[in-house]
């Protein structure tokens, strides 16, 4: 909104159906005229009398223009909010004319004497929810790359690997880049390559008191198999 704009709100009736046109660039614009007629009560005659009507041309653009063309018809009582504009032009006879128009910011039916049913139009679907196309999930980094734990490239611990991972390249609960606990190769043993609940990736050593870290090498006896459980 430019500085110095004259904001105006007008309640009136459409004198004709809106006219929808498109500019060469493809932008939609709808033009319609409304008549706002004041009414006063004459106590002498005990009747309502109409005053001089105010006629204004209204211009509305883009998506709202298409909605206006599909929703409003001649005779409907509407509420128009916008900016008052003065425009001068010259007729074919060479006479100069000045008219006032409203650049519409918002418009809708008046419900004082009528009912209306609103049909909401979705705007840019998939921009939210549980990890929709533009984020909005629990830990999603946008769209199908977030949302549920361990999915694709997100989850609860994306970028730093699970709950305790230090370099777990985009893991979930335990997924390296595949979602299921077990890193890149889907292993379920003690080698969580990229992520997991405590996996530090290939770049972080486990503490000395870690029972998995203190196990003898696989195949040398004891409890050393990669798929064996450590003693407690």
Swiss-Prot record:
Keyword annotations of the record: DNA-binding
InterPro entries in alphabetical order: NA-bd_OB-fold (IPR012340), Primosome_PriB/ssb (IPR000424), ssDNA-bd (IPR011344)
GO molecular function, a single term: single-stranded DNA binding
Domain of life: Bacteria
Region of interest (Disordered), residue spans: 118-232
Biased composition (Gly residues): 123-186
GO biological process: DNA replication
One GO term describing the cellular component: nucleoid
Domain SSB: 1-111
Subunit structure: Homotetramer.
HAMAP family: SSB
Entries under PANTHER family matching the protein: SINGLE-STRANDED DNA-BINDING PROTEIN
Entry protein name: Single-stranded DNA-binding protein
């Amino acid at each position: 909104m430019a500085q110095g704009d004259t904001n105006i709100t007008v309640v009136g009736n459409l004198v004709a159906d809106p006219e929808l046109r498109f500019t060469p660039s493809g932008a939609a614009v709808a033009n319609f005229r409304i008549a706002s007629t004041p009414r006063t009560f004459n106590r002498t005659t005990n009747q309502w009398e109409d005053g001089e009507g105010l006629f204004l041309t209204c211009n509305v653009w883009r998506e709202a223009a298409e909605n206006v063309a599909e929703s409003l018809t001649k005779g409907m009582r509407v509420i128009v909010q916008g900016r008052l504009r003065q425009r001068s032009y010259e007729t074919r006879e060479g006479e100069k004319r000045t008219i006032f128009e409203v650049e519409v910011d918002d418009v809708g039916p008046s419900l004082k004497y009528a009912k209306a049913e609103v049909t909401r139009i979705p705007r840019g679907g998939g921009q939210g929810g549980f990890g929709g196309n533009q984020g909005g999930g629990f830990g999603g980094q946008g769209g199908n790359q977030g949302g549920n734990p361990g999915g694709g490239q997100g989850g609860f611990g994306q970028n730093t690997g699970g709950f305790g991972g230090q370099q777990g390249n985009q893991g979930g609960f335990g997924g390296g880049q595949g979602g299921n606990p077990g890193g890149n190769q889907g292993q379920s043993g003690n080698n969580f390559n990229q992520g997991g609940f405590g996996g530090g990736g290939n770049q972080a050593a486990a503490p000395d008191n870690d029972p998995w870290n203190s196990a003898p090498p696989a195949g040398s006896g004891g409890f050393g198999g990669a798929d064996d459980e450590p003693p407690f």
